[in-house]
């Protein structure tokens, strides 16, 4: 992946996350549920003052420091390894974008805007940045696991 594409991808993903959050705040009342695809998913505007699954509520400064450390580590790892694997770079782009997307909310609003509710399973309400983080971390785990087992494909 060309070096210029990395910051462009990160900015585009952050932009999408922030656009969705702004749309939700402007168009859905707090705690309102809108059935987008009945039985599949709804949009529900929540203000999450904790982490995933609403743990560690009202720990803003802890999350700000943790996010800066994680993003810093991911950026450092990317700079050191960006030519190693496109999949590795993609995983780090997702982690960095998701971290920054939620960081913006936490610093600017004091909470993270969540909105995606899966209706077919009992699961926490989440946002676009959370999706980036989840996919990025799972992809990174898979890559590191494959490297650990000697399979570099």
Curated annotation (Swiss-Prot):
It is an enzyme of class 3 (hydrolase). GO terms for biological process: proteolysis. GO terms for cellular component: plasma membrane. It is found in: Cell membrane. It comes from the Bacteria. Its EC number is 3.4.23.36. PROSITE patterns: SPASE_II (PS00855). Keywords: Aspartyl protease, Cell membrane, Hydrolase, Membrane, Protease, Transmembrane, Transmembrane helix. The chain crosses the membrane at residues 61-81, 85-105, 125-145. Pathway: Protein modification; lipoprotein biosynthesis (signal peptide cleavage). The keyword Hydrolase applies. It catalyses: Release of signal peptides from bacterial membrane prolipoproteins. Hydrolyzes -Xaa-Yaa-Zaa-|-(S,diacylglyceryl)Cys-, in which Xaa is hydrophobic (preferably Leu), and Yaa (Ala or Ser) and Zaa (Gly or Ala) have small, neutral side chains. HAMAP family: LspA. PANTHER family: LIPOPROTEIN SIGNAL PEPTIDASE. This is Lipoprotein signal peptidase. The lineage of its organism: Bacteria, Bacillati, Bacillota, Bacilli, Lactobacillales.
């Amino acid at each position: 992946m060309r070096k210029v594409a990395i910051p462009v991808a990160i900015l585009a993903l952050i932009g999408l996350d922030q656009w969705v959050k702004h749309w939700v705040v402007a168009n859905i009342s707090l705690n309102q549920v809108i059935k987008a695809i009945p039985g599949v998913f709804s949009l529900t505007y929540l203000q999450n003052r904790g982490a995933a699954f609403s743990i560690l509520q009202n720990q803003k400064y802890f999350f700000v420091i943790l996010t800066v450390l994680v993003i810093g580590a991911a950026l450092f790892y990317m700079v050191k390894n960006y030519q190693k694997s496109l999949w590795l770079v993609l995983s780090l782009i997702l982690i960095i974008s998701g971290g920054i997307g939620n960081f913006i909310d936490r610093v600017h609003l004091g909470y993270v805007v969540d909105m995606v509710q899966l209706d077919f399973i009992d699961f926490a309400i989440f946002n676009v940045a959370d999706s980036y983080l989840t996919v990025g971390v799972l992809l990174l785990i898979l890559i590191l696991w494959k490297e650990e087992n000697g399979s570099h494909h």
